[in-house]
């Protein structure tokens, strides 16, 4: 199972969207405090729709608490940042990888990044853009990890509700 880690997320709608994406992909969500909202906030629930109840989510007091409670993540904790030297598509994500994203206003602190330099990845963008939306960034990197695993256990074919596809 892939793991999405949000370090101090600030915007409830982003976290709600990410929660919904985690449910849709069978991924676990890890939230590291302080959060910029309350878990029961209406905007968070609205963005996550009725999927929030199915979300596998854990909340941690801080980054050290997260590391202590997830010791297995040490060699597979990837950090998405605009400051990285490596592109996310150059990484071979493990089936149980942890992919961390920082808060919307500042990203992951540089003190953490330099300690995990070889695990830092970026999404390419034009140089005059500071960053992408957090929930979009999570979806981009998460779906690359899933693609590398051939979308294991995911429904690959869709079905029409009223009509049928031409064969």
Identify the meaning behind each predicted range.
Residues 1-167:
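Post-transcriptional modification and biogenesis factors for structured RNAs
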């Amino acid at each position: 199972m892939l793991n999405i880690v949000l370090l101090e997320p600030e915007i409830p709608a982003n976290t709600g969207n990410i929660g919904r994406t985690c449910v849709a992909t069978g991924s676990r969500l890890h939230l590291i405090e302080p959060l910029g909202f309350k878990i029961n906030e209406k905007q968070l629930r609205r963005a996550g729709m009725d999927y929030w109840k199915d979300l596998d989510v854990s909340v941690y007091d801080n980054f050290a608490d997260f590391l202590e409670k997830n010791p297995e993540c040490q060699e597979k904790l990837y950090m998405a940042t605009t400051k990285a030297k490596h592109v996310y598509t150059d990484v071979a994500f493990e089936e149980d990888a942890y992919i961390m994203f920082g808060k919307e206003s500042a990203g992951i602190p540089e003190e953490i990044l330099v300690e995990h330099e070889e695990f830092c990845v970026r999404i390419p963008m034009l140089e005059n853009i500071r960053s992408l939306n957090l929930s979009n960034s999570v979806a981009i990197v998460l779906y690359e990890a899933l693609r590398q695993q051939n979308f294991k256990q995911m429904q690959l074919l869709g079905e029409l509700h009223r009509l049928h596809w031409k064969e």
